[in-house]
């Protein structure tokens, strides 16, 4: 797949060939869904917790004798049916993480990249750099390229001025190539790759 390389000012600066093994697959929604679910499950804190009847600060003495009062049979006031009693089957501290094989994760990344390529939502830039860490300057460059919701993936190191300038834009994410992931690719409208990022992806899936 041949794609035009542009500068940050929107000027053409050659072309690059994207591998069909990475960018030319037919996207499968089921694989993408599995990977996004796996990512989001690992983000959940799992620190929710309530106290059971054995943990609350209340006496464990029987409320009244078993027989002879005419009332229903009850044990301690810490039982779940009483106000202030312990929670029955409440949430406990646990991990929400699920497992996903490495090969499926790698395949999902290829399908995410392919889905953007198929929708013509990939832009390749020769490099992404700014003279000053100014959000206004970055927005002007995005206006020339017609970008709003965008994920920028650079090489091994993200240019510091770009990272600082993009930090104040709510729909712009900047990642080094080792941080590229399915969820962040899909949640933004446009994927911007530098030539260094394309080379790194080609080497990664060689």
UniProtKB/Swiss-Prot annotation:
Molecular-function GO term, any one: rRNA binding
Disulfide-bonded cysteines: none
TM region positions: none
Protein origin, superkingdom: Bacteria
InterPro entries recorded: Ribosomal_uL4 (IPR002136), Ribosomal_uL4-like (IPR013005), Ribosomal_uL4_dom_sf (IPR023574)
Function of the molecule: One of the primary rRNA binding proteins, this protein initially binds near the 5'-end of the 23S rRNA. It is important during the early stages of 50S assembly. It makes multiple contacts with different domains of the 23S rRNA in the assembled 50S subunit and ribosome. Forms part of the polypeptide exit tunnel.
Subunit structure: Part of the 50S ribosomal subunit.
Name listed for the protein in its UniProt record: Large ribosomal subunit protein uL4
Gene that this polypeptide is encoded by: rplD
């Amino acid at each position: 797949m041949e794609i035009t390389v542009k500068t940050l000012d929107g000027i053409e600066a050659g072309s690059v060939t994207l591998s069909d093994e990475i960018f030319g697959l037919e996207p499968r929604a089921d694989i993408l869904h599995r990977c996004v679910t796996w990512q989001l499950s690992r983000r959940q804190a799992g620190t929710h917790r309530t106290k059971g009847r054995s943990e609350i600060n209340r006496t464990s003495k029987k409320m009244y004798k078993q027989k002879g009062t005419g009332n229903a049979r009850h044990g301690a006031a810490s039982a779940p049916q009483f106000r202030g009693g312990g929670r029955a089957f409440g949430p406990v501290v646990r991990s929400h993480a699920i497992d996903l094989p490495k090969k499926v994760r790698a395949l999902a990344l290829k399908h995410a990249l392919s889905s953007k390529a198929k929708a013509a939502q990939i832009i390749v830039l020769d490099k992404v750099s700014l003279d000053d860490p100014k959000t206004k300057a970055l927005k002007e460059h995005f206006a020339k390229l017609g970008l709003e919701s965008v994920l920028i993936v650079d090489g091994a190191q993200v240019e510091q001025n770009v990272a600082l300038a993009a930090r104040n834009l709510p729909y712009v994410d900047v990642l080094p190539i080792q941080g590229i992931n399915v969820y962040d690719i899909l949640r933004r409208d446009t994927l911007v790759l530098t030539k260094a990022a394309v080379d790194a992806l080609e080497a990664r899936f060689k």
